[in-house]
Design a protein with these regions (language model features):
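Conserved, structured core segments of small domains
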Residues: 1-100
Length: 100
């Protein structure tokens, strides 16, 4: 199986109802979950000219899953709790990871 990184992007949200749904989603995808990942906070942007910015993109976390192809990952992610607000502000970006 191939491995894929899920990047969670959207406005920062305090722990709440959607966060409580994550364990159920992790259980639902079962063996497809390779790395539960981690939330991200307090980022910094370092540019090639040496300048910095303490306002990085709205990247909130990541997970790693395994599947036969990206279409299977899309099916796994369609009901992810991070997308539950359903207003388009939240997204999960999917990237295939090369074999090591």
């Amino acid at each position: 199986m191939k491995k894929f990184m899920l990047l969670y992007k959207g406005p920062a949200t305090p722990p709440g109802a959607s966060h409580d749904k994550w364990p159920a989603w992790f259980n639902k995808i079962g063996d497809n979950l390779v790395d539960i990942g981690s939330p991200m906070e307090n980022g910094l942007v370092l540019r090639s000219d040496g300048s910095t910015n303490d306002s990085p993109t709205n990247l909130n976390g990541y997970s790693i899953v395994q599947a036969e192809n990206i279409n299977e990952v899309q099916r796994l992610v369609k009901d992810h709790p991070f997308l539950s607000p359903g207003n388009g502000e939240y997204r999960v970006e999917i990237f295939e990871l090369p074999k090591a």
